[in-house]
């Protein structure tokens, strides 16, 4: 029986952010920049990651998703959602359109949706892909995506020694089954996104409570019987915060994205677009590889074929 096709879905925003903060510097310790002074470190690391993924995994189907500027439905649910986040560094903001260009030049389509985050786009594409007979690989370092893992959905973290997480891996890494992840996150909260959670309950406590009670709803229904006084009082006093936090942290899988996953087949890079972009960035090795007179090699992913 032939293997199912696999759709690779790249969490572009988180990968770009991690690329920006990766230790890629010039000899003087400053950010990598091109000849015009434009920062290029996030572009360089993102491109390196993406090219490695394309070369080593040869995906037949692939897409990337990025957060869009502006409000999302989560801002409507909680006015202070992400209120603690510092403004995006200007050196990162300047690289966003360049990372988008890199995806397009390398042949990776970008899928986004107004008022939703990349997480929800990826969640929706995942469910659609499963319905069409695909398996799914989510490329991210964000533990929130563990909630989507099942026997046909895995998470691949290119920064974590290229680790794959299936349901067993999620349990080993996070301490609970994938379907329990969002309940643990709801108790913990998220300081970066200003999701409150339940005060006084950290990751270990959240894991233990959900492991014992199975679900957040069951835990809250039996909060008065929780033996630890600290947890019992916190759950009784902050049940609404736990539920609202779960709604903020749950990845939506049914949003109105106008795309057929079957059209996300990988067609390879545009050598001309790659050459132009990498020349602007000053990535000399890549410029040489995609130069008009360069010979096609095994690293030219346009040669990938499907049967």
Model-derived regions, located:
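A generic structural signal for solvent-exposed, polar alpha-helical segments
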Residues: 23-26, 79, 87, 272, ...
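Non-catalytic nucleic-acid-binding/docking modules located in mid-to-C-terminal regions
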Residues: 1-4, 58-63, 150-154, 158, ...
């Amino acid at each position: 029986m032939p293997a199912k096709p696999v759709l690779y879905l790249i969490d572009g925003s988180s990968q770009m952010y991690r690329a920006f903060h990766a230790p890629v510097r010039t000899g003087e310790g400053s950010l990598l920049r091109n000849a015009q002074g434009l920062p290029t470190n996030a572009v360089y690391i993102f491109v390196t990651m993406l090219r490695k993924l394309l070369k080593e995994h040869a995906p037949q189907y692939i897409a990337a998703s990025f957060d869009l500027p502006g409000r999302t439905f989560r801002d409507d649910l909680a006015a202070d959602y992400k209120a603690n986040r510092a403004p995006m560094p200007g050196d990162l903001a300047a690289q966003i359109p360049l990372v988008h260009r890199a995806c397009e030049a390398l042949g990776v389509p970008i899928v986004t949706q107004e008022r939703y985050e990349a997480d929800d786009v990826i969640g929706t594409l995942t469910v659609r892909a499963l319905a069409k007979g695909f398996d799914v690989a989510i490329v991210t370092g964000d533990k929130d995506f563990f909630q989507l893992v099942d026997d046909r959905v895995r998470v691949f973290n290119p920064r974590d020694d290229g680790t794959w997480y299936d349901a067993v891996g999620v349990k080993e890494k996070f301490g609970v089954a994938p379907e329990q992840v969002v309940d643990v996150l709801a108790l913990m909260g998220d300081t970066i996104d200003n999701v409150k959670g339940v005060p006084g309950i950290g990751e270990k406590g959240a894991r233990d409570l959900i492991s014992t009670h199975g679900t957040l709803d069951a835990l809250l229904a039996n909060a008065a019987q929780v033996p630890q006084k600290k947890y019992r009082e916190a759950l009784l006093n902050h049940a609404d915060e736990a539920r609202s936090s779960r709604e903020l942290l749950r990845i939506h899988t049914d949003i109105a994205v106008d795309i057929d996953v079957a059209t996300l087949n990988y067609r390879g890079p545009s050598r001309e677009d790659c050459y132009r972009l990498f020349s602007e960035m000053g990535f000399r090795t890549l410029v040489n590889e995609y130069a008009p007179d360069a010979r096609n090699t095994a690293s030219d992913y346009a040669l990938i074929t499907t049967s």
